[in-house]
Swiss-Prot record:
Catalytic activity: L-histidyl-[translation elongation factor 2] + S-adenosyl-L-methionine = 2-[(3S)-amino-3-carboxypropyl]-L-histidyl-[translation elongation factor 2] + S-methyl-5'-thioadenosine + H(+)
Protein role: Catalyzes the first step of diphthamide biosynthesis, a post-translational modification of histidine which occurs in elongation factor 2. DPH1 and DPH2 transfer a 3-amino-3-carboxypropyl (ACP) group from S-adenosyl-L-methionine (SAM) to a histidine residue, the reaction is assisted by a reduction system comprising DPH3 and a NADH-dependent reductase, predominantly CBR1.
Organism from which the protein derives: Encephalitozoon cuniculi (strain GB-M1)
Keywords tagged on the record: Cytoplasm, Iron, Iron-sulfur, Metal-binding, S-adenosyl-L-methionine, Transferase
Pathway, per record: Protein modification; peptidyl-diphthamide biosynthesis
Enzyme category, top tier: transferase
Known partners and oligomeric status: Component of the 2-(3-amino-3-carboxypropyl)histidine synthase complex composed of DPH1, DPH2, DPH3 and a NADH-dependent reductase, predominantly CBR1.
Family: Belongs to the DPH1/DPH2 family. DPH1 subfamily.
Protein's GO biological process: protein histidyl modification to diphthamide
GO molecular function: 2-(3-amino-3-carboxypropyl)histidine synthase activity; 4 iron, 4 sulfur cluster binding; metal ion binding
Required co-factors: [4Fe-4S] cluster
Keyword Transferase annotated: yes
Record-given protein name: 2-(3-amino-3-carboxypropyl)histidine synthase subunit 1
InterPro entries the UniProt entry points to: DPH1/DPH2 (IPR016435), DPH1/DPH2_1 (IPR042263), DPH1/DPH2_2 (IPR042264), DPH1/DPH2_3 (IPR042265), DPH1/DPH2_euk_archaea (IPR035435)
Gene name per UniProt: DPH1
Amino acid sequence: MVVLKQEEVPECLRYLPRNYNFETGKVLRTIRRLGAKRVTLQFPDGLLRYSFVIMDVIEKYTGAECILLNDVVYGGCCIDDESIASDLLVHYGHSCLVPVGEMSTKVLYIFVDIRIDIDHAAEMIRRNFQGKIGVIGTIQFNSSINRLKRVLDEERGGVECTLPQIRPLSSGEVLGCTAPKIEGVSAVISIGDGRFHLEGAMIRNPHLRFYKYCPFSRRMTQESYDHSTMLSDRKSEIRKAFSGRSFGVILGSLGRQGNRSILRSVVDRLKEYDVYLIMLDEISPKKLERYNFIDSFVQISCPRLSIDWGKLFKKPLLTPFEVFYSGGEYLMDYYSREGSGEWKNYR
């Protein structure tokens, strides 16, 4: 086994962006501590381009065999600890949605913290906002969000910053399926370049104004979401589904998306209907067309699949929350440990 020398680290990692923290030293130390001989790596698409650099470093400095998992990774829910026998799985780019103690192998989460220009972000906020605001983002920007809060809070009488939280997520962290109810702020600013996770917070908080600060383009934009159309569409699908005679209940098998506890709750709720249990890795209109004898479906994988793409399916495709929904607020608490609900991963 080759021993890593400090002076060699910059040369080995020169192809990785300097503001992305892949915590390579931590990964190497963990492999050595465990004596791991086979290591599997899992990356979301946005980080996949850097995977082979990291694999080369691991193999060179530990002698471990590296295997790159090829299945698509939408989020921390897609962590795949069961597909291949290995001594360690390193999952990049997401927070710990599934506790490591529940895994079938040793797992190391690497958030891939992204450093941004805090001063520019703070100046953009000072120029455009007053009073109390909320700041949110994904785990990759979480440390930057906390630094941004400290910078803004240092100026008394200016903008007051709060980091909303829904446990077990970190303060300020949101997911496309899990976001807190935010109160007492005039606006919410999301730090990041995409909309998917921001939309989770927007769906949960239709009463608030949302903005996005992109640290790469250094632009601030106001974001909107058509809550009324979304809610109308989903209520219509719920009515159609419960007017039928049968349900196909799909347990997602992509990583850890499926939850058997939710499955049991959904099946019990639908006991007056004919229920067919189905297991699928990825759900698509074409795959469900094969089940022409089933009137409607419930998918236990990703709630946003139904919310965002439900219209592409010929038959209603409900989320677990919608099976129990009786009106009122549309919750986004799929991975929340707060409150109760038979549609949630944690109760």
